[in-house]
Amino acid sequence: MKAAVAIGGTNALIAVRSRSETPPGGTDDRSNLPDRQFAWNDYIPKNNIGLAKGPSHRLLLHLKYRREGVPNRTDRETVEDALRTLERGFEWSNEGLLFTIGYSPAYFDRFDTDLPPDTGLRDPSEVIDQVDIERSGNVVVETDDAHMHLTSDNPLVLLEAEAALFGDVSEINGEPVTADFSEIFKKVDRRTGFTGAPLPHESWKEDVPGDNPVTEEAPVLFGFKSLFTDSQPSEDHVAITSSDHPFCGGTTEHVSILRDDGVRKWYSEHCTEERIDRMFSPSHNSDETGQHGRKLGRQSGTSEQSMVDIAEETVKNAREHGVVGHAQKLARARNPLPPLLRRDFPSTDNGHPHTQFISLQRTIDDFIDVRKMMSFVDPENERPAASEVPIENHGIQGFFKVIRRGNYLIPPRHLRAFPSPNP
């Protein structure tokens, strides 16, 4: 079923339809839906520590507007009708369909007016300039106009939704398709992925040539649980909440591809304790974390120290141990609250292991601040590279490469169809 989502298209849809349960239907009354497009957490189950459990199957669509200049009223109405078709067809839930559509700086450059300065959107090139250290190589800036993130526990839903958006089916879940994107948007990229064990193991086995280092119990490709109550904020925390802001109820979204070709080296060159040092911190050990981090419980620190306290020892650990932890570095930006709401997921698109990284934050500056903490042992140093440890001891940085970056504004639901910069 995961493979069908990765392949996409009519044949995959037909194959999945015969093996899938009928999903719950949606609503034609938009007042029954949250105005925040990214309000997912109240509509999906919680895991054993009370965090929202992300749906198993993911689909990302990168879209380019087919016309020059500012979108016209007819196209705006068509986009809204197409999105409402999805809402009529599927319940707003993990068993139905959850989705967002966001718009890039390149899209807003079509207009003569600017976004309000406190909206928080920035060009992805500015992110690359500030956080991607030289060894990351050349990172591609996304130049699409719009980005959609669709998710469901039912792979049939994703395939039917995509088919409806591009005019390949006449109805979804018994609802007629009254409008589509086919004359509005060009699909410039399509990315897929999955969450939750055993999908990382199974997907690697199916898609990636060679030995499979990922265990069946691993929640992600690098093996360790990474979402805790001290690393995931609420949706409120990342939302634009000022009632006089034109995009109140919106948020900013960062989207990047991390090529995880170092995963095999991660497992082959480091034992479990060494991987724990690099994923969490030198203060952690396997007795407390377990093989996949699940023994840590609600928070990512140890029984003796919070992760915020451990984070204060980052420079000291680099000097004394020659190694620092990924979570340890990031926690320096999480005091008092974590600024990034992560919705990333593993992927094996095109036979390569990836992380499709997605975060929501109040402003892109928040993402930059967090990513600097990940990039440098001592980001406040005038010469931060002088304090670095070898890349293979620098959290997980030596095991992936950033390929592409994009930033988007996710407007509230009532402004989601081709918003103007200052509606």
For the regions a protein language model found, what residue spans apply to each?
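Long, histidine/aromatic-enriched segments associated with O2/redox biology
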Residues: 5-423
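Terminal low-complexity, intrinsically disordered regions
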Residues: 1-2
